[in-house]
Curated annotation (Swiss-Prot):
Residues 262-266 are annotated as: ACP-binding. Gene3D superfamilies: 3.40.47.10. Coiled coil: none annotated. It catalyses: malonyl-[ACP] + acetyl-CoA + H(+) = 3-oxobutanoyl-[ACP] + CO2 + CoA. It comes from the Bacteria. This is Beta-ketoacyl-[acyl-carrier-protein] synthase III.
């Protein structure tokens, strides 16, 4: 990081990328493990299959591949990237996975760090990164969302094991002194409701030295109160988006695409209905990938760009929500 450019007033979006593992876990295969069925899962979640990491598909590798394709779309020299922010709750290294991605990319001039906010993580990382760029300290950044929640699922719990998959997505963002394509944003946290969705540490006491308790580090599987999380999402997400529309003087009619965290198709449809956004404007790929946590939003955006759905100057309303409980919204113009 070098000097500060006080002329930088906004950000523009230059590229997107994504990666999912090859291994596919269908609803039919899950029904061989727990008491469920393809029809039951599909009708309640909208999910048909999800991608599951095999050896080599860790967050470092998935995040690297997503970032690389975003950089290629942006047509950047890797040496000009000066900031990498990785949103993840499942780092391959508990001390942080972003530095490993930086090294693998060869982005020697980039500062790299992780940010943890679960399913809101990518949106929080996008907003945080944009503020760094607007502050004039950085010029080009990669924001990555990557998670490997399959490693933390109780595969005997049919309420939660049907939901999650693995993957990564990334956006390439550049500072500009002419306009700001991050039109507006808002973020919220309510720790009082944190027990509705968590992945708590599980400390086992080891006797290593007499009269001293040593706690070995481990994590319990994902714990979720699905009914409460659903009620939280369908209530809070429309509220925060409506407030954002009012703050930015936009209306839902001016939105080209609604991109929500891909948790459940019923949540996506309910939020769209509350905002009076037609179903054809709601982007969804959870049928193929399930809930990939911090990866869902950039993964949806990248697929929509590469299929020529999202185009230059399209207005995208997006919201992430999940464990914390945390949630947020952003209004962006692509390009």
């Amino acid at each position: 990081m070098e000097g500060i450019d006080f002329n930088q007033i906004g950000v523009s979006f230059k590229g997107s990328g994504s990666y999912v593992p090859d291994q596919i876990l269908t609803n039919q295969k899950i029904s061989q493990k727990v008491d469920t069925s393809n029809e039951w899962i599909k009708s309640r979640t909208g999910i048909s299959e999800r991608r599951i990491s095999s050896l080599g598909d860790n967050v470092n590798e998935m995040g690297y591949k997503a970032a690389l394709t975003a950089i290629e779309m942006a047509n950047w020299d890797i040496k000009t990237v000066d900031l990498i922010v990785l949103a993840t709750s499942t780092p391959h290294d508990l001390f942080g996975s972003a530095p490993s991605i930086q090294a693998k990319l060869g982005a020697a001039n980039a500062v790299a760090f992780d940010l943890t906010a679960a399913c809101s993580g990518f949106l929080f990382a996008l907003i945080t990164t944009s503020q760094f760029l607007k502050g004039g300290s950085f010029k080009r950044a990669i924001v990555i969302g990557a998670d490997q929640l399959s490693s933390f699922v109780d595969w005997n719990d049919r309420r939660s094991c049907i939901l999650f998959g693995d993957g990564a997505g990334a956006l390439a963002i550049e500072a500009t002194n002419q306009f700001d394509n991050l039109i507006g944003f808002d973020m919220r946290t309510d720790g009082e409701r944190g027990s509705f969705l968590n992945l708590p540490s599980k400390n086992n006491k080891d006797l290593i030295i007499d009269n001293i308790d040593f706690l070995s580090g481990a994590f319990s599987p994902i714990q979720m109160n699905g009914q409460e999380v659903y009620k939280f999402a369908v209530r809070e997400v429309p509220i925060i988006l409506e407030k954002l529309f009012n703050k930015t003087h936009y209306t839902s009619d001016e939105v080209d695409w609604l991109v929500l965290h891909q948790a459940n198709q019923r949540i996506l449809d309910s939020v769209g209905d509350r905002l009076k956004i037609p179903r054809e404007k709601i982007l969804s790929n959870l049928e193929k990938y399930g809930n990939t946590s911090a990866a869902t939003i950039p993964l949806v955006i990248d697929e929509a760009i590469r299929s020529n759905r999202i185009k230059q100057n399209d207005i995208i309303a997006t919201s992430g929500f999940g464990a914390g409980l945390s949630w947020g919204a952003a209004l962006i113009k692509w390009g």
